[in-house]
């Protein structure tokens, strides 16, 4: 009888720990009665002390686990929608299901959707669209090796940020190349702000930015490249050819990370930020 009582107490303690964990996981979500659809919406409904990590948001009728970045890029808050290693993202990869990381977001190729991580992860098209279409989502960005960052805010070396209204990453699936205004891009230390640059995508390969071809297209901005024109250097995905000086392709385990998000701007207090 005494043994049963001890087991019962242990069970109650375990349940309390679990419920506490879940409450932290979805705070500002179920607890407030608001069905948040992105990490940015979660931040608006929280106590603003959230740290980077795994949370749950609503995508459609269900809760979806996601990785949130609240700290690296103020005043932006980001939801991770895809991440893959160079080994998986390279166009000739033979790894199982590597095709999932060679498709534009127009197509549904989820991978490890219930376990967000950085080596091989992609949300379903429906979950991506739910985050992308949420009212506060205004931008998408690409980063490199985010899982290896130890200090915030992060450096903006090998980083790209684009406004959704300038390039609809969920809808465009065939552009060879298209010229689009990019808010900010840095490749191997070379930066361009509010530039019109070529972004490539096709039904058979992931959206990518070919820095070595920028001097021939659009505004003809030059990103010095060790490869020159042929073969072109792929950045932030596709990786038909790549440079080990670009952080996303610096090693076989280097990761490329895609995010949807926007600026956190509390209505009660206008904050002045110098946006990159």
Residue ranges, per PLM feature:
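Mature extracellular or lumenal effector domains of secreted proteins
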Residues: 2-276
């Amino acid at each position: 009888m005494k043994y049963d009582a001890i087991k019962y107490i242990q069970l109650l303690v375990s349940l309390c720990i679990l419920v506490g964990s879940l409450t932290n996981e979805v705070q500002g979500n179920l607890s407030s009665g608001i069905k948040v659809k992105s990490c940015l919406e979660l931040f608006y409904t929280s106590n603003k002390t959230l740290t980077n990590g795994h949370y749950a948001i609503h995508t459609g009728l269900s809760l979806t686990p996601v990785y949130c970045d609240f700290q690296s890029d103020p005043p932006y808050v980001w939801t991770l929608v895809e991440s893959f290693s160079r080994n998986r993202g390279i166009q000739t990869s033979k790894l199982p299901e590597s095709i999932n990381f060679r498709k534009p977001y127009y197509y549904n190729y989820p991978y490890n959707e219930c376990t967000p991580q950085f080596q091989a992860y992609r949300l379903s098209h429906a979950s991506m669209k739910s985050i992308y279409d949420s009212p506060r989502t205004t931008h998408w960005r690409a980063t490199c090796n985010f899982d290896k960052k130890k200090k915030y805010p992060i450096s903006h070396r090998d980083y790209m940020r684009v406004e959704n209204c300038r390039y609809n990453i969920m809808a465009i699936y065939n552009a060879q190349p298209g010229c689009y205004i990019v808010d900010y891009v840095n490749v191997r230390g070379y930066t361009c702000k509010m530039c019109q640059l070529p972004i490539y995508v096709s039904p058979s390969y992931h959206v990518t930015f070919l820095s070595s071809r920028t001097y021939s297209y659009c505004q003809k901005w030059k990103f010095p490249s060790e490869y020159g024109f042929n073969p072109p250097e792929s950045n932030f995905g596709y990786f038909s050819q790549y440079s080990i000086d670009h952080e996303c392709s610096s090693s076989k385990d280097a990761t490329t990370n895609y995010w949807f998000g926007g600026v956190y701007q509390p209505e009660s207090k206008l904050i002045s930020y110098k946006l990159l």
